[in-house]
Amino acid sequence: MRRAFPSKDRPLAQMTASIPVALSAVLWLAVTPAQARPVCMIVASTSGTILHEDGDCRTRVTPASTFKLPLSLIGFDSGFLKDAQDPVLTYRKGDPDWGGKAWTQPNDPASWLRHSVVWYSQRITRALGTAELTRYAASFDYGNADMSGDPGKDNGLERSWIASSLKISPVEQVLFLGKLIERRLPVAANAIDQTIAIVESQTAGGWTVSGKTGTAYPRKADGSFDRARAWGWYVGWARRDGRTLVFARLDQDETQQSVSGGLRARDALLGEWEAIAGSLPR
């Protein structure tokens, strides 16, 4: 690991037995679908103080499509991405198409993030190359910053962030997001502005919640994908009355599901957000 993680806020740790925090933990379990196991729910200030942490938030796993947040910063900072509508790229035969009709249509940066289009990500990564992507990821302290891909397959530019070499923990997600919001990342201000502008937002309990979902299947011992154990991420930030919090939620399925893990993690977080946010110290 590149650096030691900040420890939990000690006064908060002493408060975890209080009724509001205990209630939010119960709601966290209750809102999660029975087929998914909650792995981690973590909330922090943008400065990096951990305000709420349930579960295993320190183990690194694949970021899946949540990697599109740093990749958007990289794309805009490098000049490959121009603005929300430029460049418009077209689907090519052989590109990933499992995301449905939206993936086989022309896409711009806004629709790329909205529909989580894998091939659009691959156009960015191939234009930048492994060395440059690794440099950016390391400068962001983004997990292990390993963009090499599957061992011996030379596929890092295609899928290093999808159940492959790149791994990040929930606590590292919120630390990265805090630096994004506070503009402490080594990229141009315009790259941050453009990225924030294309991230989808929802409302929950008077908060505006912005974030990115991610879903990926872990590998079995034989290298095949375990479709019954999908990871589901939702990471982002929430704003209300001048206050901004960053969060990461990670679930893992126990049986194969028809709706992606990331979408279910997002909906579960939105359902519990008001209770969790209300339990936090100011």
Residue ranges of model-derived segments:
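A short, well-structured edge-of-sheet supersecondary motif
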Residues: T32-G55, G236-W237, R249
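Structured C-terminal helix/loop/strand segments within mature extracytoplasmic catalytic/sensor domains
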Residues: C57-R60, R126-G129, I181-R282
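Short, well-structured active-site flanking segments
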Residues: D77-G94, V187-I192
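N-terminal secretory signal peptides that target proteins for export/translocation
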Residues: M1-T16
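Active-site SXXK
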Residues: V61-D86, W112, Q173, F247
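Mid-domain, small-residue-enriched loop/turn segments at the edges of structured enzyme/sensor domains
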Residues: G100-Q105, P109, T125-E182
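Flexible glycine/proline-enriched surface loops and loop-helix/loop-strand junctions
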Residues: H52-R58, Q105-P106, R114-S121, G152-W161, ...
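Bacterial N-terminal signal peptides
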Residues: T16-A30
